[in-house]
Design a protein with these regions (language model features):
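Flexible "cap/lid" loop of the alpha/beta hydrolase fold
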Residues: 99-150
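Helix-loop "lid/cap" segments that line or gate small-molecule binding pockets
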Residues: 143-147, 157-167
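Conserved acidic catalytic loop of the alpha/beta-hydrolase fold
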Residues: 71-89
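Residue in the alpha/beta-hydrolase core beta-strand immediately N-terminal to the catalytic nucleophile
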Residues: 54, 90, 114-117
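Conserved alpha/beta-hydrolase "nucleophile elbow" surrounding the catalytic nucleophile
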Residues: 27-29, 89, 93-95
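Conserved HGGG/HGGXW glycine-rich cap/lid loop of the alpha/beta-hydrolase fold
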Residues: 6-66, 80
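Short beta-strand immediately N-terminal to the catalytic nucleophile in serine-hydrolase-like folds
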Residues: 73, 91-93, 119
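Catalytic nucleophile serine of serine hydrolases
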Residues: 54, 61, 95-96, 120
């Protein structure tokens, strides 16, 4: 199985199908790259190179104790793009993957990315502020972040059902 090594030593899983112009699929929170199986098969059959990536704490990637912040996630994406030598890349994203892609572009530039597709992306601002009075209070985010730092894989396991299992 193909893995890359992140800057902090975490082993991050990726899958590669087809040949041609590259498409990198970034999944939503709590999902693995397998969520893209149907899309990967269809695009690979149409002559594209399709790469699925399991972010840290997801799928077959390591579940390290730390590194569950947006900058680390996007640095992991940058490591994958660099290691695979990807250029003229199309990023296809879902939910949190959209936030990763936008942060990637602001941190690492757009030289290697030619297209960005955002599917049901996370909103750019969830925190309550003067500019976003309908947002959530900071205390809620701080409690969530503390849980993530303590044991992100456990948080995902405990909270994934509402996303996929109807009541």
């Amino acid at each position: 199985m193909p893995f890359i090594t992140a800057r902090d030593g975490a082993q991050l899983y990726w899958r590669d199908f087809g040949q041609g112009a590259p498409i990198l699929f970034l999944n939503g929170l709590g999902c693995s790259s397998q969520m893209w199986d149907y899309q990967i098969a269809a695009f690979a059959d149409q002559g594209f190179r399709c790469i699925g990536f399991d972010r840290r704490g997801h799928g077959r990637s390591d579940q390290p104790a730390g590194g569950y912040d947006l900058d680390t996630f996007t640095d992991d994406v940058a490591t994958l793009i660099d290691e695979l030598g990807l250029a003229s890349l199309t990023l296809v994203t879902h939910s949190m993957g959209g936030g990763e892609a936008v942060r990637y572009l602001t941190r690492h530039g757009s030289e290697r990315v030619s297209r960005l597709i955002l599917l049901a992306p996370t909103t750019p601002m969830l925190l309550k502020s003067d500019d976003n009075p309908g947002g959530a209070p900071r205390a809620g985010f701080e409690a969530l972040w503390a849980q993530w730092r303590r044991d992100y894989p456990k948080w995902v396991a405990d909270n994934i059902a509402p996303f996929f299992i109807p009541e």
